[in-house]
Design a protein with these regions (language model features):
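Hydrophobic alpha-helical membrane-embedded segments
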Residues: 52-75, 150-154
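Alpha-helical transmembrane segments, especially those used as permease/efflux helices
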Residues: 55, 59-60, 104, 112, ...
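Cytosolic juxtamembrane helix at the C-terminal end of the final transmembrane segment
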Residues: 153-166
């Protein structure tokens, strides 16, 4: 099996900002969980309230590892990566520089996913915490975040496609 080499680039500035925002949102989720537990408003949902930030922190850690070691993963274990078809269409030209830039831009989407995971973590923590007092979950807020994330991912992939196919 031939080793695929790409020209390595650092993350885009926007991706770095999205990573910081996502990590801050997860930190806020932890702070909210501790707040709801310290106010002692929740008796039976203590475990669920701590599991939400813990699970989202674990997923964020995995995403950060994939983003950090993206080139190593692609070069040594390409079968582990599920890249969008746009990457392979760009790669038809065999231009390593162009392919490396596109590969790097694809991981901006991973940074965006990290940010939306942080937002969902906050919403779930708020939902569980406020549900103990008012019994009104935030169901519609989940749908809005998921819809915005789907549209955002589509728009970023479209931007990548237009940039490299023109």
């Amino acid at each position: 099996m031939a080793v695929k080499k790409l020209q390595r680039y650092g993350l885009e500035k926007g991706a770095k900002i999205l990573i910081v925002v996502g990590l801050l949102l997860i930190l806020i989720s932890w702070i909210l969980a501790v707040h709801y537990l310290s106010v002692n408003q929740i008796a039976k949902d203590r475990l669920a309230l701590l599991l939400i930030p813990l699970i989202f922190t674990a997923v964020a850690a995995i995403l950060l590892l994939v983003i950090k070691y993206r080139y190593t993963l692609f070069e040594k274990y390409p079968y582990l990566m599920n890249l969008p078809s746009i990457f392979y269409r760009i790669g038809e030209g065999k231009d390593k520089k162009k392919k490396g830039i596109a590969f790097n831009m694809i991981f901006t989407v991973h940074s965006l996913v990290l940010t939306f995971l942080g937002l969902l973590s906050i919403l779930l923590t708020l939902s569980i915490g406020s549900n103990a007092k008012t019994s009104s979950p935030f169901f519609y807020s989940y749908f809005i975040v998921i819809a915005v994330s789907i549209v955002s991912v589509f728009l970023i992939y479209r931007r990548i496609y237009i940039k490299f196919m023109s």
